[in-house]
């Protein structure tokens, strides 16, 4: 298989951008920008999220068994870039972002249009990113979208011509 063709083809898959947050008992909250996300079931409502195994949010989610998927909206490129690096909790803010706490104990970004609380039901431990299969246990709408909900989501391509993840 041609390496460049593989990258090109896989980069044609569109992705939204999300900040996944989790907090394991006795640890600081962790957060990371993620984009390999999809809904996989209506009943029960399930999501699948690919997460890099050496990330803090991976460790916190695996230890706690739950997380929040904060859905970034149009214009939130700054938040996406912020959580490309490890998060820090300072003065009640997570890497400068105001937060509140979900019922499952993970942080919710107040600036995110929506956040989804999830309970991990399975971890597929294959590849350099493991896949969390998780049931949606709660939702928080901070800003109702005008028009189609899927058009309100920040997409990878909106981070610039040279920003890719995948391939």
Where does each model-flagged region fall?
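Basic, polyanion-binding surface patches
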Residues: 1-167
């Amino acid at each position: 298989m041609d390496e460049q063709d593989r990258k090109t083809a896989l980069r044609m898959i569109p992705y939204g951008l999300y900040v996944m947050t989790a907090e394991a008992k006795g640890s600081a909250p962790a957060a990371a920008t993620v984009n390999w996300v999809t809904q996989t079931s209506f009943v029960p409502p399930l999501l699948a999220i690919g997460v890099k195994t050496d990330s803090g949010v991976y460790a916190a989610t695996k230890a706690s068994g739950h997380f929040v998927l904060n859905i970034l909206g149009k214009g939130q490129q700054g938040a996406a870039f912020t959580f490309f690096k490890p998060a820090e909790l300072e003065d009640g803010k997570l890497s400068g972002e105001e937060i509140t706490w979900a019922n499952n104990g993970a942080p919710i970004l107040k600036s995110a249009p929506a956040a989804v609380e999830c309970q991990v039901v399975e971890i597929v431990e294959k590849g350099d990113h493991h896949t969390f299969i998780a049931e949606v246990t709660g939702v928080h709408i901070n800003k109702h979208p005008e028009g189609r909900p899927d058009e309100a989501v920040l997409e990878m391509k909106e981070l610039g011509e040279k920003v890719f993840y995948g391939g």
